[in-house]
Amino acid sequence: ANKAPSTRMGNAALLREALLKAQQYTSKKEAGEDIKFDKTMESLVPVMKKELPILIHCHRADDIVTAIRICKEFGLKYTLEHVTEGYLIVDHILENDSLCAVGPTMFYGSKVENRERDFRTPIAFSKAGVRFCFTTDHAVIAGRHLRTTAGIAVSWGMDRDEALKAITLYSARHMGQDHRIGSLEVGKDADFVIWSGDPLCFLTHADVTVVEGNVVYEREVL
């Protein structure tokens, strides 16, 4: 019979147990001890060594708080994905400098956990100074609608420059790549798009796409 826990307390205990095993496995491996190969634990070694972040799927405020608490307990790098009820605990997220990917916002509440899905969290984050990025959770919402999401957030009252950063610089920061991409600065990769107008307007087209200084796309006018 499946004896997996059906409560949030039980799920948190499972996560903590897995991380504790990974912590012990990593310590023994680094000490050169003879250990039995475990592919699941091996996948967590880079997480325990802070080489990679652990991505936490969370919608509800209580789940977000639990995720932050457990990650801090083990001293992990982490990112929070979805963060639907983040607007309820803005100060807590800001205090912990948590990296958040908010969304998909252009989607109905498909379950109890995300029934509060709308643009309250991005607006609250923007006003409080939380540097978050948007996610469409492709293929829930197609990735091409990312800039549309940012544009709608502006219509709700989000600062336009912050909305643009939420799909560029802050997205790069979320992936740990802001030293290379996300903004036009000396020393970064020459990756950018030339738009026909405001990139946050759905009527705007991408005219030219440049990757590492090379033009890889030019729009043909029909």
Regions found by a protein language model. Give the residues of each.
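Polyanionic/metal-chelating signatures
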Residues: A1-Y78
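His/Asp/Glu-enriched, well-ordered alpha-helical/loop segment
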Residues: P53, L94, G103-F107, K111-G197, ...
